[in-house]
Amino acid sequence: MGFIFWEKSARYFDEIIPELPKSIQKVGVFVNASLEEILKKITKYDLQAVQLHGDESVEFCETLKKIIPKEIEIIKVFSILDTFDFQILNAFESVCDYFLFDTKGKLPGGNGTTFDWKVLRNYSSTKPFFLSGGIGMEEMNAVNEILKTNLPIYAIDVNSKFEIEPGLKNIQLCREVAMQRHYQK
């Protein structure tokens, strides 16, 4: 479950996280935050993963990887419009646990639009990734098709199209997707 710690976001979170089942991983979402800020949030909210949604460099990710506990995962986001040079990912391979591919838009996420997933055919890494960007119920057939490929898709990241309002998910829609995925396995 993602908690957005970027103050310019309509989904900005600065409250107390309610008690969650241990099976739900708490992910802090950051945009060009300092190492100090990320460390503070990891401690304050007992985060299990950090999602970097800004212009964080390989060096930044490498430093973060060295100073956070080993069990905390790093997810580096890359925004895609029509094309993408997957070669730039090579330098991030050893300093990130996952990649996340989102649609390039005005905001760093939550734009509600999809990118052309055909570009992922050029993904040659074995590094698992999250598929994101404007995924709603209307896209679930296409999601199910791409999940049948050999791509190392780790998870589907849903956001704006599953919200009642920014930061508040429609639980019924989330259940529908989870049940749909469960019965298709």
Regions found by a protein language model. Give the residues of each.
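Short intrinsically disordered, low-complexity coil segments enriched in acidic
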Residues: 1-3, 16
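A generic "structured core" feature
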Residues: 73-75, 130, 137, 141, ...
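Conserved anion-binding
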Residues: 5-12, 21-132, 136-139
